[in-house]
């Protein structure tokens, strides 16, 4: 019974995003993918409102879609304005899908160093004709430019948990690694940024410190980020990040979830 109530609740939430008819279409396509999943290495797809979203497996879709649409990880009010958004850690494009549903004319910069995830991201951009509005940059982000190894789970090539540190190996996970370029974010910010999303599995504080050093954080109106404390690798406390943001004119909201997400915005 509780599961039925949860499904009804999810249906109502999605209807608020894309309308009743589109939610029915989505539900039928979702059930088809559950019953008859795509062959290994083939991409599945589901219509989500006016768009079609491609993904490697229904279980992978479940996790990302639930986090972003049902748990409402991101909060962007609906707007027709061409807002400027930076998506750090775009993965296969689920956050981009949310952005485009909430702000259809948004101009978005996507950063994604994982080549497998980036291929699916490119597919979603191409199939939905977002090419004029969306740019992809194949870089990891950090406090300094350079070259580093990027680690991804062997069993999930598109994993959203890819990181520049191999902390998952200590948990017994088998990892693949790629050599990737690390870039700094500041020189991509030349004018106001309406929304900055950061989910990069560890180096969040370094990215923000670089923006402060280059006097670019003041150009950002709102930030949502996922803070990662990774023992042995990224161990600076959350209080340092909150202090940095507050010193630069933001007020902060901390939402403890698993993993924790944090929404911050300028004081008014």
Task: Please report, for each region that a protein language model flagged, where it lies by residue.
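Phosphate/nucleotide-binding beta-alpha loop and adjacent structural elements of enzyme active sites
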Residues: 1-268
């Amino acid at each position: 019974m509780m599961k039925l109530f949860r499904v009804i609740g999810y249906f109502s939430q999605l209807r608020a995003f894309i309308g009743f008819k589109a939610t029915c279409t989505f539900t039928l396509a979702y059930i088809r993918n559950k019953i008859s999943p795509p062959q290994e290495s083939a991409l599945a797809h589901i219509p989500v409102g006016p768009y079609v979203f491609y993904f490697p497996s229904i279980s992978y879709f479940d996790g990302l879609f639930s986090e972003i649409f049902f748990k409402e990880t991101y909060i962007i009010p609906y707007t027709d304005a061409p807002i400027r958004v930076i998506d750090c850690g775009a993965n296969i494009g689920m956050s981009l899908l949310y952005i485009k549903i909430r702000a259809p004319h948004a101009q978005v910069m996507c950063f994604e160093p994982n080549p497998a995830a980036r291929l699916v991201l490119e597919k979603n951009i191409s199939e939905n004709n977002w090419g004029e509005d969306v740019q992809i940059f194949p870089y990891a982000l950090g406090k300094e430019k350079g070259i580093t190894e990027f680690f991804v789970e062997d069993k999930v090539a598109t994993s959203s948990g890819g990181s520049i540190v191999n902390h998952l190996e200590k948990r017994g996970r088998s990892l693949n690694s790629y050599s990737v370029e690390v870039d700094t974010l500041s020189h991509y910010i030349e004018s106001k940024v309406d929304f900055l999303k950061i989910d990069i599995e560890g180096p969040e504080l370094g990215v923000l410190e670089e923006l402060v050093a280059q006097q670019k954080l003041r150009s950002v109106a709102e930030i949502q980020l996922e803070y990662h404390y990774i023992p042995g690798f990224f161990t600076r406390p959350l209080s340092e990040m909150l202090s940095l943001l507050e010193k630069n004119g933001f007020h902060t909201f901390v939402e403890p979830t698993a993993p924790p997400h944090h929404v911050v915005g300028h004081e008014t």
